[in-house]
């Protein structure tokens, strides 16, 4: 059963909805040009009121290790998620779990089926169907997991468009990730209607959703509950 992260939390109410529905982790976006950006002091207040055993993930793009370290300390984050072209080795000294986002070309969108707008206007992670060799050469403590997101129209991250889970090239990519031994966190266009199929086809360590549990650009309590309920269903053999 995968761990579930609700990303783009901006209010205490949204955090409470996610926790009550059974989320394992909450994501706070510290990318200034994201529409889901949250001020560190606001995130800190939300985090101070969370129950124990909920992971607190800070999402960054092209931020210096010093800047990330300050927010980690201020907000008591236990995980950072890097969405730019950062070298994970530069953040090795930070005593947190480190996740690196990797962008994979998305499946064609069937019409205008998503309410999502891109989260990150500054992300420069180049979409590719193969992992860079540098991922194979990282020293210990530099990386603890790979988050796989979708890219479309020159945008990477937060596109709201699903990944091509069924295709041979995508399945081959999953094998590459598996060979590295890093846990896979699946993102990219997940929603309550497709999450169970996505889990069955990819068997990820975790899943990450933001726009898929929103209505009119804000988190929706019923969508969060439905998403987590679907993700918790036991997959058939």
UniProtKB/Swiss-Prot annotation:
It catalyses: N-(5-phospho-beta-D-ribosyl)anthranilate = 1-(2-carboxyphenylamino)-1-deoxy-D-ribulose 5-phosphate. GO terms for biological process: L-tryptophan biosynthetic process. The keyword Isomerase applies. The keyword Isomerase applies. Pathway: Amino-acid biosynthesis; L-tryptophan biosynthesis; L-tryptophan from chorismate: step 3/5. GO terms for molecular function: phosphoribosylanthranilate isomerase activity. Its EC number is 5.3.1.24. This is N-(5'-phosphoribosyl)anthranilate isomerase. Belongs to the TrpF family. Pfam families: PRAI. It comes from the Bacteria. Keywords: Amino-acid biosynthesis, Aromatic amino acid biosynthesis, Isomerase, Tryptophan biosynthesis.
